[in-house]
Amino acid sequence: MDIEDKSSKMHCMKGKHVAIICGVVIAVGLILGLGLGLGLKPEACNPPEDNGLLSTKPPTTSTPNVTNPSGSSVFCSAKNDENGAWTNFRLPNYVQPVHYDLDLTPEMEAEVYTGMVNISIRLEEQTTRHLWLHLRETKITEMPQLRTSSGQVIEIKRCFGYEPQEYVVIEAEEDLRPGNYFLSMKFKGYLNGSLVGFYSTTYGENGKTKYIAATDHEPTDARKSFPCFDEPNKKATYTISITHEHDYEAISNMPVEKTISLDNKWTKTIFKKSVPMSTYLVAWAVHQFKYEERISSRGIPLRVYAQPQQINTTIYAANVTKVVFDYFENYFNMNYSLPKLDKIAIPDFGTGAMENWGLITYRETNLLYDSQESAASNKQRVAAVVAHELVHQWFGNIVTMDWWDDLWLNEGFASFFEFMGVNAKEEKWQMLDQILIDDLLPVLKDDSLVSSHPITVNVSSPDEITSVFDGISYSKGASILRMLEDWISPDHFRAGCQKYLTDHYFKNAKTDDFWKAMEEVSGKPVREVMDTWTRQMGYPVLKVDLNSTVTQQRFLLDPKADPSKPSSQFSYKWNIPVKWKEGNTSSITFYNKSELAGITIMQPSDLPPDSFLKVNKDHVGFYRVNYEPQVWRTLADIMMKDHQNFNLTDRAGFIDDAFALARAGLLKYADALNLTRYLQNETEYIPWQRAVVAVSYIGQMVEDDKALYPKFQRYFGSLVKPIASELKWENDEDHIKSLLRTTVLEFACNMDDPEALGNASLLFKNWTSGISLDVNLRLLVYRFGMQNSGDEQAWNYMFEKYRTATLAQEKEKLLYGLASVKNITLLNRFLNCIKNTTLIRSQDVFTVLRYISFNSYGKTMAWDWVRLNWEYLVKRYTLNDRNLGRLISRISGTFNTELQLWQMENFFERYPDAGAGEASRKQALETTKSNIEWLKQYRDDVATWLENSEQPNFV
């Protein structure tokens, strides 16, 4: 009896949902058994013989005597002592670190490291006998030492770990009065078993296993690497030294001051003293990589490090770095503040990239680009992530948010400016418009859920801090900055950014500090307006009536949700700069939240009678717009006659708004679907990309409906056919056209277009025969070729290609192909591979599970595997891992049955501790309930419209 079966009777008796659940549990169990082999011996992953690329582990080597701890004793053991202020989550204000001398010695092959830190501390105002700072997992190996600024030793009475707040507490024998002190601590940590803190990973080079060790500290993992005051406003300077074997090199935030050869095996690299910085930005790496270098216009060396065999893949990132670096120095009117800037591609990296000051770390897919192996989407991803991390060298590093509740001051700004940065390098990529489909429109969906949260949100635990690294902080933050820039003007916005950076140089800041800078340069009530966007969740939908009167209400995807919950200090009313256009006239009419009757847009009197009032021109505002039904129908006719009456961002916005409004019950699906008729004439990437996303929700909901889904496929297949036939299964050098081609051919395949699927299968067959594929078609061919014609032989061939591929972007495409097979046995084998770290890196586990969940055969299998292996995942990644926290919401987005909802609630009851996934769980539940209601409310409306569309006289 499996885990689920043990509790199924109890939950059936609760009568939570529908009576038939209990009746189908046995049948479902049989189905799950087919999918996962429950009750049967699961098929092994059967990894091939080790070729030395990843798993071979050489013998342990000796450590130099310089920092080797005496013996193996552990000091400062954990105690449950709650008789002090160390029970508080936040560090006390009266203790300030001033400088860290940090010395580290990693044993690469033994996967351990030792270290010593000497912290200069300033004690302000208060007298105390206790000091505490952060430390997690890493062990103290000698009793800490405390000295006054004059060198006098202060006896330590005791030290202990307080695990609930991840502190090590030191108690002195005498009172510590205000003044300066030096705290010294020796410690030992482990490089294996994690992708956070100071950790190591391996890669293959000429059949040998190579090691690299690097750091990832944001948000609360510096404390895993070394004892520190691990809060962003505890800025200090650092002098870092690393002792390593001769055949390794070390890099850190600052340039090398000097290197010292200790003996015939060990070298000590000492780095220059840093500027004041937060703990989460402290970084170093020990490696055997090579680099590509560019020099900025001011003479700053810009290096990109990668494995020696991949050094040619760093050229594009190096070129982007130089252009974007120079662009931001000019835009912000502020020089980059360090003497050098390095970037390094880590073979196994838990996040996309990390903006460490002077040493930016990346997942390989986000830094390395090969023109012979990488697609246009990969190229754009590299450019965007490089630009994003460069923004942080100003927003985040020079000026850092005071606390994590203002994370958006880092991530929202980087997400906004990255589009400007890429645009400076690639002017033909429509990047200033692509923010619409990459950030604004996707996050409108997230922020329409009751389980959303404000941009500025209280956080009081590492899990809560981790959880706010989400679309609200990043994409909503970027979107409201775009709206602000448009309202106060680009020149004022730029001047405000420059003032903010200057006023808080090397310091910490809060959201109000940014509003203040913007108010001073623009003369507008920025704080009064923008607080309504940052201090309450959600956004409005503006209703435009036939008299051009505009009213607002909170937009919620669930029409049954209470729009007043949870409570908001602004009662879910917003101050809105409403941008509009009619004819050749464009303007902004301000909508104050106190205007309860709404506002009226005053249009010019000389407009032509057939002009259309477009509210939210360029979709620059963070809100949706709803018109009267007859206006939507008029709009559909205008778009059919000449869709270029509206620019491509407006066309994308119309489609996205219409389908969101229909899903929320504010517009009939007939009117939303009616708007899509014009797509047969659409030739631009941005509108097509958003149209596919908008209508695909319907497809996902009715995919198992044998009567309705074919009609859905026929209708939308007919719309995509013209552009798919025009673009063909061949490629050219045009970047935007490549993105368009991938989008429409993928949609054509999903609509079961015979020609598209035939081409995918033919190219797939050619590929399995050794014929190379165009880089921009590979993902499509791998997915749909495997889906429609892949057998075990083809799957094994692809798996071998994955195993031997060296470029991470190609490996990721092959993972998607492997996950697309319509064979339960092979999918089960693939799931079993997840636990084999030789075959699937830790960074890729959640990617594999998501890809399998996209497969109609694999959706249930991925969900079942996660539930059965949850304890394994928690042990491997911890509940603080943001990717684990989001996993369930990412694989359950299309769940739409009472059984799936029951399974989810059952699972959450069994494992109530969500860690960083608390908000994600709420989102998953809300989305599943919404999907169930959608089928009840709108399935028949969609069916009626699609049936009518097949009639000969349909117009």
Swiss-Prot record:
Positions marked as site (Transition state stabilizer): 474
State the EC number(s). 3.4.11.7
Residues crossing the lipid bilayer are 18-38
Give any Gene Ontology cellular component: extracellular space
Compositionally biased spans, kind Low complexity = 55-69
Report if keyword Transmembrane helix is assigned: yes
EC top class, as a word: hydrolase
Catalytic site: 389 (proton acceptor)
Region of interest (Disordered), residue spans: 49-69
- Which residues carry the site feature described as Binds calcium which modulates its enzyme activity? 216
SUPFAM superfamilies in the record? Leukotriene A4 hydrolase N-terminal domain, Metalloproteases ('zincins'), catalytic domain
Superkingdom per UniProt? Eukaryota
Would you list which residues are glycosylated? 65, 118, 192, 312, 319, 335, 458, 547, 584, 592, 647, 674, 681, 759, 766, 823, 836
Q: Record keywords: GTP-binding included?
A: no
Q: What reaction(s) does this enzyme catalyze?
A: Release of N-terminal glutamate (and to a lesser extent aspartate) from a peptide
Q: Write one Pfam family the protein is assigned to.
A: Peptidase_M1
* Cofactor note text: Binds 1 zinc ion per subunit.
How is the activity of this chain controlled?
The partially purified protein is inhibited by the aminopeptidase competitive inhibitors amastatin (Leu and acidic inhibitor), and bestatin (Leu inhibitor), by chelating agents EDTA, and 1,10-Phenanthroline, as well as by Zn(2+) ions. Substrate specificity is modulated by Ca(2+), Ba(2+), and Mn(2+) ions which enhances the enzymatic activity for cleavage of acidic residues.
**Family according to the record:** Belongs to the peptidase M1 family.
Name this polypeptide is given: Aminopeptidase A
Which species expresses this protein natively?
Gloydius brevicauda (Korean slamosa snake)
